[in-house]
Amino acid sequence: HVRRYLAYLDQARYARRTANRHLSSIKSFYRWLVVVGHVPSSPAEVIQGPKQGKPLPRVIKQSDMERLLSATFAGKRPEDISAIDLRDQALLELLYAAGLRVSEASGLLCSQVFMDEALLRVMGKGSKERIVPLHKTACLALARYFGEGRPALMKGPSPYVFLSSKGNPMSTNAIRAVFKRALG
């Protein structure tokens, strides 16, 4: 009966979450029936609810992205652009153009950047490697960061692309803070 009821909910186009809530209530009711002795066991305990779909990732609007990419240098004279500004611009361009995850950008090594070919070799989730092409704008921002910004941030040798003001690899939280600053 319980499976038929779940099939009815599916045919009636109820959301999976709603069907799972109904199933949870039925299971609770049967557990109570077992406790008070009305039934010997719960037939609902072995039934699994419908699988929940994964939500789509949030996507930033194009107007917000344009504002984000122009925020780093906004209102600054060329001589006032700092190493941090160059890093942040390269970081934002790279995240946008290459579709990197924050964790991938945080762990990106210089040996994984191939400027001549405009490619990145990225270690993604589950240690899966992928090759990512770079847009011209991201290449230009990275080249400027490698030439002017990164050397000013280095306090010693580091294999990481994106460095903090102390010369350490940028953490994922520090990268998220760049987004927050840029979005105001």
Q: What is the predicted role of each segment?
A:
Residues 1-184:
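Conserved catalytic core of the tyrosine transesterase superfamily
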